[in-house]
Amino acid sequence: MCERTLIERRITMYKLITDLDKKQYDAFVEQHPYGSLLQSAGWAQVKNNWDHVFLGYEKDHELVGAAMVLIKHLPFGFQAMYVPRGPIVDFENTEMSVSFLKAIGKWAKGRRALIVKFDPNVTLAGYHIGEERIVSKQGEMLVQAFRQAGAVYHGENIDMKPRFQAEVHEEDMEKILTGKHFAKMLAIADKKEVEIEIAHLEKLEQFNELMQMTSKRKEVALRDASYYQRILETYGEKAFLMFGKIPLRKQFDAICAELESVEEQLAQCRDKPKKRFTLEEKRASLKRNHDELKDLAKEQETAYLCGVLAVVYGSGSEILYAGMDERFKRYMAPYKVWLEAIRQCFAKGAKICNMGGVDGTLQDNLLQFKGNFYPVINERIGEFDLLPYPKLYDVSSKCLRLLKKLKK
């Protein structure tokens, strides 16, 4: 075979599929080592304020790559595109990865896309807190290859929370429970009679209330109930809500009865200073709890203290959202709820549970809580931009700023 024929075979080896069947797409992504919930077909339904396309990449008629591309339409017929946690391909094969990326760029140019933002599900470094950070050679090589292919790299930003994720691995579950601080927090939650409830759409209202409380407390805009509903409906039994709750009225009645008993005992031991001191301390504690629950017990029989929304997809899972009623922060319910949510993810077949982003400095408040779960800090390689029209870079930069707002 002549050299020219070999070159032609190499060029025609790959084929981009621009209308991949949804079921075929999802089957490929869900079982792929680099697959991700945010690249699932269902995520396109959740992000219903975007258009979307399912791309496939074939090698000798075999599907070897896929990408769910979210699309926003811009003035004058232009588009902005986003490939969350993708594309999906064997990133250990640099040649194939770059070829797929170039094919996406060429296709995007034909669609008049000014920018294609993507953040592959590739680890640059993975380590437990306190361990040495060792950078993956594969990750470094991939960054270099994508840059050479024309992608603009933004991964150096340590303030980008989506780049740093706290992940719990199934084999580390026993180590979580050996932590002294964690055990203490669980003991408080148990003493406060925090109960666990797993639910779905039937408790959407309670979850949304907790999220709205969190939104108000943090002074940030969060999703509305319809968004959480779409996630639960889209992923069905793969998704769940997990709550921490207390039998509020029952607890209040018990506190009242115990407080009355303590008052009676105090009246009968005026000449026993040590016993009185102990009883007075107990009375103060009971009175504090009484005052804390008095008005709340009039409003509701059961109080929902905190809740999370989680989804299992393939061998991974994500705790996507978490809300809390700050009035019950002393109950330490999140420790118990997150633990049970992680266990539930593993029971549904996941091997890893992603607790969400943390600051790259590893010193933020989020990590103070998440660090109790012995997580692996998965430092992904970060975000890239493809610019199909490089000469329109200034316009593309404005689109990028717009995209950061829109992709939420």
Label each region the model flagged:
Residues 80-82, 115, 241, 316-318, ...:
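Structural preference for beta-strand elements that scaffold enzyme active sites
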Residues 109-127, 346-357:
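Conserved GNAT acetyl-CoA-binding A-motif
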Residues 82-84, 310:
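Catalytic phosphate/metal-binding cores of nucleic-acid and nucleotide-processing enzymes, i.e., regions
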Residues 17-77, 123-125, 129, 137-139, ...:
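A conserved beta-strand-loop-helix scaffold within acyl/acetyltransferase catalytic domains
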Residues 94-106, 329-343:
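Conserved acetyl-CoA-binding loop-helix of GNAT-fold acetyltransferases
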Residues 86-93, 322-331:
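A short, internal acetyl-CoA/4′-phosphopantetheine-binding micro-motif in the GNAT/acyltransferase core
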Residues 1-12:
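Short, Lys/Arg-enriched N-terminal segments with co-localized hydrophobic residues
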Residues 22, 130-173, 347-408:
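Active-site/acyl-donor-binding loops of N-acyltransferases
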